[in-house]
Regions:
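N-terminal Rossmann-like or analogous alpha/beta NTP/dinucleotide-binding catalytic cores
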Residues: 8-166, 237, 267-279, 283
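Active-site loops and adjacent core secondary-structure elements that bind or stabilize anionic groups
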Residues: 2
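Active-site cores that bind ATP or allylic diphosphates and position pyrophosphate for catalysis
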Residues: 140-279, 283
């Protein structure tokens, strides 16, 4: 029938337009809105990017001091970014407590957003106010075939993991286990129009049998296997991006040059570098 013929001729762009029908700006628009910073060579742009799911702890405090000092020593910029996409765990007065702590210890950022006031030219500095930006970048990934809708249910994913564990295989959504990776555009469009819930996954091109070297400013050269996990970059319930995706877009557009964070994040480097083609890598 006519509907089937129309769906059969659909492209990745049609799929992207179906998922994001109301975006008014493109990736190119945002690249122009956030130009390179006018700083001297060697100036460090650093950030403190807490989630308002708790109060500042010693780890936060230590990384804040390092980021603050590094930016001041190089005549750079230190900014505060509120990563508030985990609304279910958000604590009402967390942002106020963070700002009070920064002010008390003379660690106030050069750029920030607080109580409706934006200080700086690279805001908004609150992630929940940047959703359309993330959507524009996810839409572009879908258009070029580097992201796709995944319709796997929680039960399906639990069964997958259980099966992998029983067979002592590496767990995750990758390769032949990435059930929705190669479904046709036509099928994806039909299932979305039928109201089937979905997330958006990044389509990785990594090979875990291959290695790459990452240059860490503290630990030096570190070798990792490439990432082949098709990681979720947009959730299904509220169309919010995941942390892994949102912070990369932000660091790119805000022109962050150095990231100081805990060692527990080292294992995420392969994933972040596989996503980094949307931006330029920052230094860690």
């Amino acid at each position: 029938d006519v509907y089937k013929r129309q769906v059969k001729n659909m492209t990745n762009k049609d799929l992207a337009d179906l998922i994001f029908p109301n975006l008014t700006k493109t990736v190119e628009d945002y690249e122009k809105m956030y130009p390179e910073r006018n700083l001297k060579e060697g100036a460090a742009v650093t950030r403190f990017a807490p989630s308002p799911t708790g109060y500042m702890h010693i780890g936060n405090f230590m990384s804040t001091i390092i980021n603050y000092v590094l930016s001041k020593a190089t005549n750079g910029v230190f900014y505060l970014r509120n990563e508030d996409t985990d609304k279910a765990r958000e604590i009402p007065d967390a942002v106020e407590k963070i700002m009070e702590t920064l002010e008390e210890y003379n660690l106030m950022p050069d750029e920030y957003e607080y109580q409706g006031v934006i200080v700086g030219s690279y805001g908004p500095y609150i992630q929940s106010e940047r959703i359309t930006i993330y959507h524009a970048y996810i839409k572009r990934l879908i258009e070029i075939g580097r992201a796709y809708p995944c319709f796997c249910t929680r039960e399906t994913l639990d069964d997958l993991r259980k099966n992998q564990e029983e067979k002592k295989m590496r767990t995750g959504y990758y390769g032949r286990f990435a059930k929705c990776r190669n479904i046709s555009t036509e099928e994806a469009i039909t299932r979305i129009k039928n109201g089937e819930p979905y997330v958006i996954r990044f389509k990785s091109e990594g090979n875990p049998d291959k290695k790459f070297v990452f240059e860490d400013l503290v630990k030096g050269r570190i070798e990792f296997p490439e990432n082949d996990q098709d990681t979720i970059i947009m959730k299904s319930d509220n169309l919010l991006p995941t942390y892994h995706f949102a912070h990369l877009v932000d660091d790119h557009l805000m022109h962050t040059t150095h990231v100081v964070r805990g060692e527990e994040w080292l294992s995420s480097v392969p994933l972040h570098l596989s996503l980094i083609h949307i931006s330029e890598p920052t230094r860690h």
